[in-house]
Structure formats: structure tokens, C-alpha cells
């Protein structure tokens, strides 16, 4: 059996189908490696010339939490055998760790949301003097807005976690984070997609009253399309709009590029917003980047074709 040129590690088939279609169109010889049910022999050679990791930290909300540690072990195995891995083990570890993401922003001298990590609500009593409410509760291993909630007091937080112990998943580390005051209906948030260290496109996401800002059509459909998101909304939400943002300021692109380079990602996205008091705050880092085809097309290209073209270059280099 011949070795394919490319192996794409994935867990969510709907998210990856547009990329698979783009690879098929280009005639790329690739293996779609579904890690939901998989095994590998530690004596086996690498299964492809290039490995592209597309695992999502939110796999656990779809009942696939076992895919994440398996994928991390697999990436380490590939790398130890000398494979060329895109968005490899160190990149994946960073995506799984929002504490590390915040620390990276801090170390780069960037503005970031005030954050406190905890594994027991009572431990927060020692930090009450520094707590500010309302605040956002989120898991250290996040994704797709899962397990997030706004809380207005320490007692409310305690009650919430007692009523819904699943909020401690996938690991027993939670974050209480500054609620960044902004206008979601007009200002919204900005997501910048990067490919091979360069900005692919920027888009503005407006009209969101919940936490799921995933740009996948499966999570936030367009028009009459039907989605199948596994992350239910805890509060009524309006339909978000994903708008091209070609006029993103040059100084933002410069700062974002600096942050992206520091992540070590090959492909990914950053999110920031402008607060009501004019702070520009980056708050999220994503290696598994769900592209929005309509945004790319509005700028004159299909973003999935761009990724497929990039992967072809990696294969031939």
C-alpha cells in the first residue's frame, strides 16, 4: 500500500468536508484520519509525508473527548519519528490551554482579559478583593463557546456549578474572566484567519448574544441552510452575522501577526474586540480554524482552496 502525500487528522467530519472537497478537486492524495476510533502501532512508520492536525478542543461536547488525548499522543508519535506535522503537538497543547494563551499575550506585552483560574469555588474566597462582576465563566479547554456562562456574583457561580457539574468538563480547571464591555450588535468581535503566518482574511462577527462564535456553517448556518451544532445555547441568541472586514487596521494586523508567530501555529485564527473604553483586547487563540467560505468569496477567493493550495506547497517542498 502506497503512502499518501497528506494525512488530515480530524474528529468533526462536517467541519472538514469543505477542505476534503478542495483537496479532491486538486487531486491531492490524502488520508482522512478520523481519530474518534483509531489505533496506532508504535513500531509503524509515519503514515503520510505531511500530517495536518485539525482536531478541535470542543470534541468532548460531541461525546468525543477521548479523541483529544489520543490525537496528542499520535502527534507526539509522528513528530518523534521525524514527520512534518502542521499544527503539531506543541500547537495543540497551546490550543487546549487558555491559561497558556493568556500567559502568552501577557508575555508579549499585549492587553488581555483579567483572568483567574480555579479548581474549587471556595478557593476563590481568598481572591474576593480582586474579583469583578459580572464575569465570564469558561473552561480552560474551551471551544465553540461550550460550558460558558455569565455570572454576577461568587454565590451565583457556586450555585451554577452545583446545579450543573458538567461545567467542570473536560478537565477540572475553570476560568473566571473579565467581561469585556462592548457593543455586540454593532461593534461585535473581529476574527483574523492566518495561513502560513500571513493574514488570509479578517471578518467581523456582529449580532451575537450568546457565546458560540464558531464560523462553521454547521454551527451558524447561512440563509436557509440547516446546522447541527452540538453546543446548545444557554440563553436566547440572535443570529450572528459574519461580515468581511478588509479594512482591518494595519497596526492590528501587525500585533496579531506577532501573536500568531509566537503561537507556533501553521494555520489558525485570533479574535479581538474593542471595548467601550477603547481597549483593543485579544482574547482567543484557535488552531483548528473553521473558515467561512462566504467571507472569503466576498474578498475574491475560496478560503478552503487557499488551504488546499498551501498543503500542496508543503507536500512539494
Per-region residue spans from a language model:
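Conserved N-proximal alpha/beta basic substrate-recognition cap immediately N-terminal to
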Residues: 11-114
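Short, solvent-exposed loop/turn elements at beta->coil junctions and helix N-caps
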Residues: 39-40, 177-182, 271-273
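Generic beta-strand structural signal
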Residues: 117, 194-195, 274
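C-terminal active-site "lid" helix and adjoining low-complexity regulatory extension at the edge
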Residues: 247, 261-267, 274-317
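Active-site nucleotide/adenylate-binding loops and adjacent lid/helix of ATP-dependent enzymes
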Residues: 2, 7, 82, 89-188, ...
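Short glycine-rich anion-binding loops that position phosphate/pyrophosphate groups of nucleotides
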Residues: 56-60, 141-142, 288
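Protein kinase-like catalytic core scaffold
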Residues: 135, 188, 200-201, 268, ...
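Phosphate-binding site of ATP-dependent enzymes
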Residues: 152-260
Amino acid at each position: 500500500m502506497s503512502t499518501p502525500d497528506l494525512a488530515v487528522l480530524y474528529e468533526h467530519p462536517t467541519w472538514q468536508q469543505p477542505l476534503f472537497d478542495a483537496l479532491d478537486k486538486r487531486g491531492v492524495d490524502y488520508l482522512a484520519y478520523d481519530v474518534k476510533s483509531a489505533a496506532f502501532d508504535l513500531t509503524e512508520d509515519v503514515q503520510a509525508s505531511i500530517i495536518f492536525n485539525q482536531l478541535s478542543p470542543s470534541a468532548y461536547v460531541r461525546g468525543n473527548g477521548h479523541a483529544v488525548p489520543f490525537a496528542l499522543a499520535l502527534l507526539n508519535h509522528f513528530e518523534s519519528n521525524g514527520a512534518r506535522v502542521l499544527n503539531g503537538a506543541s500547537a495543540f497543547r497551546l490550543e487546549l490551554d487558555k491559561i497558556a494563551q493568556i500567559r502568552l499575550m501577557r508575555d508579549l506585552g499585549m492587553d488581555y482579559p483579567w483572568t483567574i483560574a480555579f479548581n474549587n469555588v471556595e478557593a476563590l474566597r481568598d481572591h474576593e478583593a480582586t474579583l469583578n462582576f459580572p464575569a465570564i465563566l469558561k473552561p480552560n479547554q474551551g471551544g465553540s463557546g461550550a460550558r460558558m456562562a455569565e455570572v454576577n456574583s461568587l454565590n451565583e457561580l457556586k450555585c451554577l456549578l452545583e446545579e450543573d457539574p458538567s461545567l467542570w468538563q473536560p478537565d477540572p480547571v475553570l476560568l473566571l474572566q473579565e467581561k469585556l464591555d462592548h457593543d455586540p450588535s454593532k461593534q461585535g468581535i473581529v476574527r483574523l484567519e492566518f495561513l502560513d503566518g500571513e493574514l488570509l482574511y479578517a471578518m467581523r462577527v456582529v449580532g451575537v448574544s450568546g457565546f458560540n462564535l464558531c464560523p462553521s456553517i454547521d454551527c451558524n448556518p447561512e440563509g436557509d441552510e440547516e446546522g447541527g451544532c452540538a453546543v446548545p445555547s444557554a440563553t436566547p441568541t440572535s443570529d450572528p452575522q459574519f461580515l468581511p472586514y478588509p479594512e482591518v487596521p494595519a497596526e492590528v494586523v501587525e500585533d496579531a501577526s506577532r501573536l500568531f508567530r509566537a503561537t507556533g501555529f501553521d494555520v489558525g485564527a485570533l479574535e479581538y474586540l474593542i471595548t467601550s473604553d477603547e481597549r483593543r483586547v485579544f482574547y482567543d487563540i484557535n488552531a483548528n480554524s473553521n473558515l467561512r467560505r462566504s467571507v472569503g468569496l466576498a474578498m475574491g477567493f475560496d478560503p478552503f482552496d487557499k488551504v488546499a493550495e498551501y498543503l500542496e506547497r508543503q507536500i512539494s517542498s
